[in-house]
């Protein structure tokens, strides 16, 4: 109960976070199922190989939502909802409540259920987002461009959209990864408003990419799990007290990130190659 009250008290924090629209304008939603089974390439493109040079053709896309198309493996999700999320641009709203009009694919029948995050893939118009948040979006765009050009990751977190009212606790399994219409980065992460154990309920795979012209930003949030992690973050690891866990959080995160980096990509569910293949197939029209 103490942790719940603490969490509730932090909901007023004005850190940029969950991009939850406060507008009364409803999103336009279209629902569809995956009707074609097309083999996914066994190996996704790597950071050192441009997508067109891998020699392994991507499957034909079987999922389209507005300007975005991709190949959705039926083994990963059985269907999807396509929606156009309306703009939320109240200048008096916190940054995590501000967004341009954008396209979202929400996966249904996903291989993992009852996770903190819903599996989604979003496409944001960069110019309008930058107009709405001029002190935030250009900085994130520059950071993403530096990483895709081969720059170091540093230790202050990786560029990420949507904006959350929580902090990026860690990242692991980082890689530069091209997609059909651009380039980006993928990594595992977890967000929280307090020192929270990394766990299978909250951890997710994310892809953050951009088109070469800088017009669109692609963001994917896809839950994952690994046998190394606990089911949830209700208790600190190894029987510690919360005070002890908080005091040693930096050491804990560094050690856990190293352990996750050492796990085989196929040990995750869904596997990292399966998720890489999904985001690599994204095409922006």
Region locations from a protein language model:
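N-terminal Sec/ER secretory leader and immediately downstream segment
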Residues: 59-166
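Signature of long, low-cysteine stretches enriched in small and polar/charged residues
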Residues: 151-215, 221-230
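Intrinsically disordered, low-complexity Ser/Thr/Pro-rich tracts
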Residues: 1-102, 184, 280-285
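Residues that cap or initiate secondary-structure elements
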Residues: 24, 111, 129, 193, ...
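Polar/charged alpha-helical tracts
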Residues: 49-52, 57-59, 78, 92, ...
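Low-complexity, polar-biased intrinsically disordered regions enriched in Pro/Ser/Thr/Gly
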Residues: 86-97, 156, 194-202, 228-245
